[in-house]
């Protein structure tokens, strides 16, 4: 099974630990992570316009992202065979 979280910072945040860089948008990030975890397919994520779902390119080819706010995004990969996200990370996208 692929690792769930790509970086330690995101894993700590999800486990309830305070992550200084994420405090300004913590509530929004938790909400988006809940939506991501509950999605039965990536098409379900596309159906919510507020997610601003997109397939990424360049050095992030094969990854997808949903929006937390104008600066931060949740990037992840999706397994088609079992329909779940993995290598999830919260990134400063700009």
Q: Model-predicted segments: where are they?
A:
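Arg/Lys-rich, positively charged N-terminal/basic patches that mediate binding to nucleic acids
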Residues: 1-33
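Short hydrophobic alpha-helical module
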Residues: 16, 39-42
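Short linear functional motifs in flexible/disordered or boundary regions
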Residues: 22, 41, 48, 87-88
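Enriched for short, Lys/Arg-rich terminal
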Residues: 57, 64-94
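Conserved phosphate-interacting/catalytic interface
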Residues: 36
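A short, surface-exposed loop/turn module that caps and links secondary-structure elements
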Residues: 41-64
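Alpha-helical interaction segments
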Residues: 2-4, 12, 43, 61-68, ...
């Amino acid at each position: 099974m692929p690792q769930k979280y790509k970086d330690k910072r995101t894993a700590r945040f999800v486990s309830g630990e305070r992550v200084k860089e994420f405090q300004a948008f913590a509530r929004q990030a938790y909400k988006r992570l809940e939506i991501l975890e509950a999605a039965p397919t990536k098409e379900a994520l596309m159906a919510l316009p507020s997610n601003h779902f997109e397939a990424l390119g360049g050095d992030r080819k094969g990854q997808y992202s949903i929006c937390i706010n104008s600066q931060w995004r949740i990037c992840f990969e999706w397994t088609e065979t079992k329909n779940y996200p993995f290598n999830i990370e919260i990134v400063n996208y700009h």
